[in-house]
Amino acid sequence: MLSLQAMAKMAVATNTYSKYHYPILKVFGLWWKNNTLNGPIKICNHCNNITVGEYPMCYNHGMSMDVALIRAVKDRNISLIQLFTEWGGNIDYGALCANTPSMQRLCESLGAKPPKGRMYMDTLIHLSDTLNDNDLIRGYEIFDDNSVLDYVNLVRLKIMLTLKARIPLMEQLDQIALKQLLQRYWYAMAVQHNLRIAIHYFDNHIPNIKPFSLRCALYFNDPFKIHDACRTVTMDPNEMMNIACQQDLNFQSIYYCYLLGADINQAMLMSLNYGNLSNMWFCIDLGANVFKEARALAGKKNRRVLQYILGLNIFKRELIPPCKDPDPSQIQILLKNYILKNVSTVFTYYCQ
């Protein structure tokens, strides 16, 4: 049950007030100031999110009660920890990111279970498996700069995160810091499952995430996100094509890179090398013609049937009309239900 003081603060936080009330709000404990925040604390009447400062939309700047509590624990702001806990924040999440013994004791005094053993890893896996905007944001906030992860098996953790994210988070296991790896992991999970609120939150809170957002968009075949990321990120079209070819059936990503000037012959060979044959046939439909090199590569990979098929002189090229500009709407309409034309040519040849 809420204390009378917590109820009074909640009543004030859910109402509108002017700048003339700011001195009172500071005294009243409804003010949050740290390195990134400095303003009055408000509660959105529609979604119960916490906002700090004069923001008209909590979607853009708000945080759930749990996230507000987690960030208060990281700030070591005792009064806000107590307040957000009374308002309904889950103090167990606070205990998982308590960065000093005194903060840990405070969380436990407010009802948190003492974190033990696998509780940290179990929580990380659980929050990413629910595929929920708020849970991904909670996971990011709990484990960002969390010193407890210094004591886990880093190689095993990195492999697990990469497998769950379904996208290469790094080139080599020792090439990236754990903090950056986790940031990429939460972002990749949000993009993979199209969790727009989480994506928007991470775009605003994870520094230098834009280059990785382009990689995610290419890997998960989203021309709209590719188009958006290309406004702020500069990447060589052939490097973009390499990323697009790593996941099969990425026709829209491949076509976008092709329109930017990426080498479609190189894309054909990369797709074959990755074992993504649908991508390879799509490149042939676009005009790729390095059949001699492709046959040699198929032979090295012991794909004898494919090696023979690629030697047939039956293929048609440039079967897809090029767009003038890489317009994501046109690309999606053109390729959403695309049928590989040269695959049909092969079937027709053998069925005659």
From Swiss-Prot:
Up-regulation conditions: Expressed in the early phase of the viral replicative cycle.
Keywords from the UniProt entry: Early protein
InterPro entries according to UniProt: ASFV_MGF360
Protein's UniProt keywords contain Ribosomal protein: no
Domain of life, per lineage: Viruses
Entry annotated with the keyword Ubl conjugation: no
GO BP terms: taxis
Entry similarity comment: Belongs to the asfivirus MGF 360 family.
UniProt function note: Plays a role in virus cell tropism, and may be required for efficient virus replication in macrophages.
Protein name as annotated: Protein MGF 360-16R
Source species of the chain: African swine fever virus (isolate Tick/Malawi/Lil 20-1/1983) (ASFV)
